[in-house]
């Protein structure tokens, strides 16, 4: 038997200690436990506290781990992360399967309430303005393979489809190599979402990925406060939906989150987006709600006709074009390109959300929303302590150590130079005080100099 006092302990990571302090001041654990209480049974085996569940998913963002299995491994290996989770030395960390069960049981509406609570934390720290909103989208790689696609009608596989086409082209009983060669050379091939789907994740859509390949994906859309870089709304949508249509739901969600977080003190007055969102119907829809649009216009050499369009469409189009061409519009577009893209870089590239390991648009949305939640906490911490991720803390320590080493080297050089200057000054003073000519008063010297 090993006494508890003999078990290894950790003083904790300074970044996670600051995050725990921030959550404790906002009473985060009490809030999420109150929300989840109706979903827990009174009897039975003690369950995992909701605060521990959310903290483990936060760790996935801060450590750049995309899978729940990897998160569980990382937490079990680190004493500082165990301290962040509030686990005793004798307690084991939750298994990855427990994270899956909890995620499936928690409804998406509850995750959205917790997201609004984090926005309230940002508002209390003066980090939520909600006036100018930048909107953009990116693709998320789905947990589905193109080689397993099936027909929506009938469920036929891609291989069976190719075999039928090969037989129609005169190739009887084609081999796998012949099918691949036939598929590579045939013209007019098209893989449409109307005809094909993934049997493992029917919600995923066939689309072009960031690297130029074709695969199953989802679309993640952010609405970012351009003044503070807080993400006020984030949702996952089918990858084949047009940006001009999904922006309406995103703006509605953003305003609803702001109302919940600020008690209706913040109102969206400006929406900034790239040319992918330029749709006259959407411009009119936003204008009717008192929102000024700064949407980059598409480059269209054709002369547009407005006689067959509803009243007000031409005016909305031209007003948006004039606003975007002014200095303020150009400044907002630069800010959108910088800050909205930065949110995707933090959440997807370094935060582990680019590749999804769960299936179904609802499950992907819940997992992604918690990751964005962690990103907002990182923005708050970056304002309070100067860093928003543990790796930034390590980089800052390295930078400060380098600065300290340089300062000590410079100081040593100055001290050495000071000693050298003192020696030179002393020698110079000696030269000044030493007489240039020596006159002797001895009789011998006097007689020798007499005329």
Task: Please provide the spans of the model-predicted regions.
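Short amphipathic alpha-helical interaction patches enriched in hydrophobic/aromatic residues
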Residues: 40, 60-61, 83, 103-106
């Amino acid at each position: 038997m090993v006494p508890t006092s003999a078990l290894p302990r950790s003083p904790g990571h300074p970044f996670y200690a600051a995050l725990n302090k921030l959550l404790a001041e906002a009473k985060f654990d009490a809030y999420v436990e109150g929300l989840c209480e109706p979903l827990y049974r009174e009897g039975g085996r003690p369950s995992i506290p909701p605060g521990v569940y959310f903290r483990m998913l936060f760790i996935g963002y801060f450590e750049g781990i995309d899978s729940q299995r990897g998160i569980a491994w990382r937490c079990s290996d680190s004493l500082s992360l165990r301290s962040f989770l509030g686990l005793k030395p004798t307690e084991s960390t939750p298994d990855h399967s427990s994270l899956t069960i909890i995620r499936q049981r928690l409804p998406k509406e509850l995750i959205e309430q917790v997201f609004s609570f984090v926005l309230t934390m940002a508002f209390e720290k003066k980090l939520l303005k909600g006036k100018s909103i930048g909107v953009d989208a990116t693709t998320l790689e789905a947990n589905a393979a193109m080689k397993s696609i099936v027909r929506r009608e009938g469920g036929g596989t891609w291989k069976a489809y190719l075999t039928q086409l090969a037989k129609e082209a005169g190739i009887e009983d084609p081999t796998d190599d012949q099918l691949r060669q036939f598929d590579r050379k045939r013209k007019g091939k098209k893989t449409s979402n109307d005809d094909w789907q993934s049997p493992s994740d029917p919600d995923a859509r066939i689309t072009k990925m960031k690297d130029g390949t074709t695969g199953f994906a989802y679309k993640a859309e952010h609405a970012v406060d351009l003044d503070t870089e807080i993400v006020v709304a984030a949702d996952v949508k089918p990858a084949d939906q047009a940006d001009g249509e999904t922006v309406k739901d995103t703006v509605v969600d953003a305003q609803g989150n702001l109302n919940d977080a600020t008690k209706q003190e913040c109102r969206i007055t400006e929406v900034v987006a790239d040319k992918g969102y330029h749709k006259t119907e959407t411009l009119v829809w936003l204008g009717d709600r008192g929102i000024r649009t700064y949407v980059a216009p598409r480059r269209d050499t054709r002369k547009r006709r407005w006689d067959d369009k509803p009243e007000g469409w031409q005016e909305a189009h031209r007003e948006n074009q004039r606003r975007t061409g002014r200095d303020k519009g150009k400044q907002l577009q630069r800010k959108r390109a910088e800050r909205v893209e930065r949110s995707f870089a933090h959440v997807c590239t370094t935060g582990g959300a680019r590749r999804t390991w769960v299936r179904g648009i609802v499950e992907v949305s819940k997992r992604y929303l918690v990751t964005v939640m962690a990103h907002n906490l990182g923005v708050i911490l970056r304002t309070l302590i100067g860093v928003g991720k543990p790796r930034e803390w390590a980089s800052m320590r390295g930078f400060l150590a380098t600065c300290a080493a340089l300062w000590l080297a410079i100081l040593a050089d100055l001290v050495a130079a000071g000693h050298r200057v003192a020696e030179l000054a002393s020698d110079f003073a000696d030269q000044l005080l030493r007489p240039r000519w020596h006159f002797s008063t001895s009789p011998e010297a006097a007689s020798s100099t007499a005329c």
